[in-house]
Amino acid sequence: MEPLKLLPAFQDYIWGGTRLRDEYGKPCDLERIAESWELSCHPAGESVIMNSVYKGQTLKSYLEQDWAARVGEGAARLSAFPVMVKLIDARQDLSVQVHPDDRYARVHEKGENGKTECWYVMDCDEGAALALGFNRELTKDEFRRAIKQGTVLDWMQLVPVKKGDVFFIEAGTLHAIGAGILIAEIQQSSNLTYRVYDYDRVGADGKPRELHIEKAVDVTKTWPAPPRRNIPLTDYQGYSVALLADCPYFTVTELHITEGAAFPASGGRSYTHLLCTDGEAALVYDNGVAMPVVKGDSLLLPANFGAYSLRGKHCTFLCTQTLPR
């Protein structure tokens, strides 16, 4: 069994740039690449396997052929793959938006998932910032009025960002990624977004992009959001590690490899998704077989994969799993 290299699905939203192609080698001919969906079984864009005997299969098809063995105990209890991992290149400001939780989505959105997410800032322009939650508690009526007056950003916390910052965005948290930020986003497998402000932009059809005011008012937590997470790395011989997020949908770990690190088989507990965010390395498995990995590569190790190691000098990975609870 070999690690599976994944080809992402691409989205060309109007605010996207070209960094994912220019700096991360993403093979896409779109004029702009706003998002690459690196790990996705979502019908709006599925990852495709690039190597092995499964080359050309969608990730969803591959997992469903042996569901429990490939997704692991943590996700096997679910009827669909619970996680999406994406890269976001915000060349322009994203809309001010919010995502519902599972309960609201399943009632009002035909059984769709809600969306809790984790952001890892891979890079950013000097002075870049994002808007996150409110700067004071508002009533629902105050929030609705601010939306209709186009002043909602005046009531939000503006947070300057730097490379390596981490944010955990629970469903119901109003937010907006600012221009000049490159983010790795680990989220529930959902494409539900309720926009409340979009800078009066028009979409590809020449019409203003739709706002979703009443649904947003229903689901938004109208109080200040928790700040960024400053999570120190814990050093071990040859590598460092930090737990970035841990929730029922996903567990995210940052791995910084300085020489090498060995990892045991998961024992069927969870798949492992590895996203190389910086540097280059070798993934060594099956008694010495080495697979080269470079910045931007996205790899899936099914839950029945064996022990492996990562070897390299100053390379960084985000490791995503869905662990048993």
Where does each model-flagged region fall?
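His/acidic/aromatic-lined binding-pocket segments of jelly-roll/cupin-type domains
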Residues: 85, 94, 111, 117-120, ...
